[in-house]
């Protein structure tokens, strides 16, 4: 392999983020594949939304809704058999909203113990009342 082609390979990591919380771990199944045989991006987005909601739920202490996908980047394809680890970190707490980042790492089926960042995203969630209207988040 030439030096030029190795520059296009994703960087493999031996460890996962220490400054973020593991909020979800999942293995995609064959039903989650797209027409190319990779995992469908919409499935990855849905899992990121679920993972992203874990930290805001602690602050909302009640109903909440996703109000924005501020950023979403697919860095590498997710493959059948990958073990996906979703890490999240608090970015900001507003009056009614919580913003978090989510980073997704794949442990490839044939490369156990090595991780590749496949997705990164930023989500904003808003605390809502029983009528679906924004409500203040209690500061603790």
Model-derived features with residue positions:
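HotDog/MaoC-like acyl-thioester-processing domains
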Residues: 3-6, 12-14, 18-24, 79-83, ...
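A positional/architectural concept
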Residues: 24-26, 30
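A conserved, well-ordered hydrophobic junction motif at loop->secondary-structure transitions
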Residues: 31-46
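Short histidine-centered beta-strand/loop micro-motifs
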Residues: 35-38, 57, 76-77, 113-115, ...
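Active-site helix/loop of acyl-thioester processing domains in fatty-acid/polyketide metabolism
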Residues: 42-62
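Small beta-barrel nucleic-acid-binding modules, principally OB-folds
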Residues: 61-77
